[in-house]
Amino acid sequence: MKIKSVEPFILHLPLTSDSISDSTHSITHWGVVGTVIETTDGLKGYGFTGTHAHLASDRLITACIRDCYAPLLIGEDANEHQRLWTKLARYPSLQWVGRAGITHLALAAVDVALWDLKAKKAGVPLWSLLGGARTDRLEAYNTDIGWLSFSLEDLLAGSARAVEEEGFTRIKLKVGHDDPNNDVRRLEAVRKRLGPDVRIAIDGNGKWDLPTCQRFCERARDLDIYWFEEPLWYDDIAGHAALARSSTIPIALGEQLYTVDAFRAFISAGAVSYVQPDVTRLGGVTEYIQVADLALAHRLPVVPHAGEMSQVHVHLSYWHPASTILEYIPWIKDHFEEPSNVDGGIYRRPQQPGASTTVLKESFERYGKSLS
């Protein structure tokens, strides 16, 4: 299965709302930036990363795929994903460019495409190729009802709809107002509306400092918060560890960590209770597995950050024994041949060969962007 071509692409896909905001970002579209790898026997593998649809930076990722990685891949055996991952990740000329950010996002897209090829060649879904499903039910939690930009009225209506009409028993709400008391009041209202049995997680997107987080957690301690995601700046190991010691609310993080070494540092410091790897930020499926195995060794649950990558994470979550639940944000799923759909709060287990990353032709035609 020799690699014949490596062709990058950019899609800018509309959200389910006109725009959304959390504590640090405001966007109207989601970027799906990736590559199609074709082999000499006619198979095509699709892989991608997720962005905020900023075209100039998206083009940096596709340039890295086209100009840096493609020449290293042409003629190689696509089956040898581990060797190829190491070849790209450790390529000497790229070491000073960066071992995170653009180079790793590009690596993720390539690696996912290689796994997609491998599963298609075997004629099975990725979860089956990896060793089979650990369960027949993967529960979803809904984040798309909880954006910080939503009014309290819309927040309550969306949360109630998700639970009472759509079958979700878990939701996640964004926090991070300049005055944290606003967030406490919103959480109190949602908890009162939904009752005690719904699991409510929160996500700060790294907005607050440690004293603010500690005061917030004290005020919110009776609201039965399932986890507090990214309460502090993403690289602050000591701060997260201090918050973990001072609060009864478990900490979740990982979407902004790019290497297994970064995860190891947080885990070793006791700074995380729920591990949230993302194949689009890590170097694809290959490095994701390393992180999930690390979490398993420390008896920590894995709950992938899946806002833009549930297409692949649904396979990994059905398979890996450390996995528990999976995030649901339905922005991009309908642009793929096999969408990562949820029925009654449960993810459908994929059935088609591959990693569920094959993009619909009409989505390329309608939402594709120029690479230059």
Regions of interest found by a model, annotated:
Residues 354-372:
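Extended hydrophobic packing segments that form well-structured cores
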Residues 131-247:
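Metal-dependent enolase-superfamily TIM-barrel catalytic cores that perform enediolate-based chemistry
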Residues 3, 42, 69, 110, ...:
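Conserved, mostly hydrophobic/aromatic
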Residues 218, 224, 235-346, 350:
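Shared catalytic-loop signature of beta/alpha-barrel
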Residues 49, 142-144, 173-175, 202-206, ...:
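A cross-domain feature marking catalytic cores of carbohydrate-active enzymes
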Residues 105, 111-148:
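Glycine-rich, aromatic-flanked loop segments that form ligand/cofactor-binding clefts
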Residues 5, 38-121:
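Metal- or metallocofactor-binding catalytic centers and their adjacent structured scaffolds
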Residues 1-41, 46, 50-54:
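Structured beta-strand/loop patches that form or line metal/cofactor-binding pockets in enzymes
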